[in-house]
Amino acid sequence: MNQSAGIFFYSQSTKRFLYLLRNDDKSNTWGIPGGKIETGETLIQGLQRECIEELNYFPTDAKLVPIQKFINNNFTYHTFFCAINDEFIPLLNDEHIGYSWVGHNQYPKPLHPGLFNTINFDVVQEKLRKLLSKIEK
């Protein structure tokens, strides 16, 4: 089974999420860091590698919270949440041409179709609401 993973980075100091603008080859849509898990990698190892490739960043003390596991035929996509103290400036690779930190429910447009579906899934919204309410107490 093919697996991919993505991550919502949330800055506790600004209460904003990181989104990445994919390049022309990737349809100029906004998404989150992540990508394909390679053979021999664990889910977390693959997600860490993808973040370092795409952002040159992955927090050493990351506490990853699973948000969603989506299965479609021979493909599984895992979505995680990670609260960090402060925003950072990502050093983007050639897959992306921009980034933006935006507030909850203030998504940049157009969203990648897969991320659009994830964000609009009620269970995902409820999990994010619960996580944010715990953090913001």
Each model region followed by its residue ranges:
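Short beta-strand
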Residues: 21-22, 69
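Unchanged
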Residues: 35-124, 135-136
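Conserved N-terminal beta-strand and adjoining loop/helix that marks the start
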Residues: 1-18
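Short, well-ordered strand-loop elements centered on a beta-strand within folded domains, enriched
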Residues: 14-21, 87-92
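A generic structural motif
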Residues: 10-12, 22-23, 83
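A short gly/proline-enriched turn/hairpin at secondary-structure junctions
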Residues: 31-32
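A conserved beta-turn-beta hairpin within the catalytic core of GNAT-like acetyltransferases
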Residues: 25-28
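Short intrinsically disordered terminal tails
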Residues: 1, 136-137
